[in-house]
Amino acid sequence: MIPIDRHLLFLINHEWTHPSLDRALGTLSCLDFWMPLLVLGAVVLVWRRGWVGIACVVVCGMGVLTNETLVAQPLKKWTARPRPYQSEEGIRRVDLAQGRPRLFSIVKPPAVEVVAAPDRRGAGRSFPSAHTLNAMTLGLVLARFLRQRLWWLLPPLMAWSRVYTGSHWPSDVLASLGMGFLLTQTVLWVAWRASRRGVPPFTHAAPFLAPGGARPSLT
């Protein structure tokens, strides 16, 4: 374990904390909360933007599928790196409160537990962070298609949340940000090449896929 990795973990997970951050970052890190909203957002995007919306959803799907099947799951099995709460005492595990549907748990106090002893059950799945990989994909693709740079904030916020909630080491998320950027740029390049060859739905989104195309605005 790199000393600075452990030091940063305890700063973010223990020192730089606040009840409002527990709620905000615990919610951001909870996939069950966001899944119905992601589906709804995809439907609205297709309804509002037509073929361009379909292309955006397809590119996001390609990126997430690439992240999960070619990178995240194979590397998790190969490295078997324990999560912080599996290897360190005193880790704060922060999560959205339990409930069904999870969406309604936003009104409940977040679940915060201090791990007295490492929980070594289960295989280590800390590296890489799939949440961070996929957040990078969504952030870059949505910034490109919606032309809003604010989406660029999603990847670093997700990376922060994964360390804050005790789910990953800082080195996990930093490496995942880099890998996610390279993988997403590759997927965007493949989609752009497909648009040049007349492959639908990418042909309808060529201006958004072209390298050096229209730059997103700040809003």
What label would you give each PLM region?
Residues 41, 66, 70-71, 75, ...:
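Alpha-helical membrane-inserting segments
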Residues 42-74, 147:
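Interfacial segments of alpha-helical transmembrane regions
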Residues 61, 92-96, 177-178:
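Transmembrane helix-bundle signature of multi-pass membrane transporters/permeases
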Residues 101-219:
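Membrane-embedded catalytic cores of phosphoryl/pyrophosphoryl-handling enzymes
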Residues 1-40, 71-119, 206-219:
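N-terminal transmembrane-helix/juxtamembrane module of multi-pass inner/ER membrane proteins
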Residues 31-35, 52-56, 148-152, 170-173:
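Short, aromatic-rich membrane-interface segments at the entry and exit
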Residues 48-49, 79-80, 165-169:
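Short helix-capping/hinge motifs at transmembrane helix termini and TM-loop junctions
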Residues 37-48, 135-141:
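Hydrophobic, aromatic-rich transmembrane alpha-helices
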